[in-house]
């Protein structure tokens, strides 16, 4: 079956794009999708679908205050979005300005820190921070949370808490692993009380997660690269779960991408690396049995991933139901619980 970009398009009324979080994390809705069966529930009901012995795998990345504002030496305004720190004093970043800064030029950020433009590769600039300034410290001191482009407002005080998961601990992302935003301590406690386990991976979400697919022939699309870490304890927890007949529940497409990337060359192994894995229908999943995820943008690689996991027609029907039922979409929107379909097309 040959798929094109148009196979992953759908009509979404703009008013269904959530612009702010709900008052409570777990107050969001949950669309449970198991083949042709759809069930409208609340996220607080998630533990009802988890069995004793199942294992949920979370992404513990923390969103950086990656957006900085400043000026060039010429006085022109610049907006800097740090994609990733490189060591303590360098970073890759996207820069928005009327004219791109030249290598060797200096930017003054937040009227406090002078950084040097070392060079450019594609859409990213290589920046050097002062020797007495750690990149992450500068971001936390002067930066702003980088809300997604479809949230049409500036980040506010509420986002400081709500655009981070309650278990975020490894700084490095420019976007939240949004499936994790629904979990609060009460839901986590109920999952543990049911006998479910929790394990952790880290995948630092890059700015490329918002880049559109620009080719109709999906084989020509190249994914952005993201850094991940799979701890040995997580590998062992997954092995125990499998041995005892439990299911592995990936919380979010970021957890899914980390797990499946680490299992492509053979059995799942602990370690760290980078992945540009592109998951399309026909992909053979090796780790996750279920997936907790939000609703994704039309024509996005994440919509392709969930279609690969549960089936293109299944996801198409589920999204049509979600639109008709006025679910809230994208980062601050509602959630889905999907079951893997090994015969998905």
UniProtKB/Swiss-Prot annotation:
Pathway: tRNA modification; tRNA-queuosine biosynthesis. Pfam families: Queuosine_synth. It is found in: Cytoplasm. It comes from the Bacteria. Its main location: cytoplasm. Its EC number is 2.4.99.17. GO terms for cellular component: cytoplasm. The keyword Kinase does not apply. It catalyses: 7-aminomethyl-7-carbaguanosine(34) in tRNA + S-adenosyl-L-methionine = epoxyqueuosine(34) in tRNA + adenine + L-methionine + 2 H(+). Gene3D superfamilies: QueA-like. The keyword S-adenosyl-L-methionine applies. Transfers and isomerizes the ribose moiety from AdoMet to the 7-aminomethyl group of 7-deazaguanine (preQ1-tRNA) to give epoxyqueuosine (oQ-tRNA). Belongs to the QueA family. Monomer. This is S-adenosylmethionine:tRNA ribosyltransferase-isomerase.
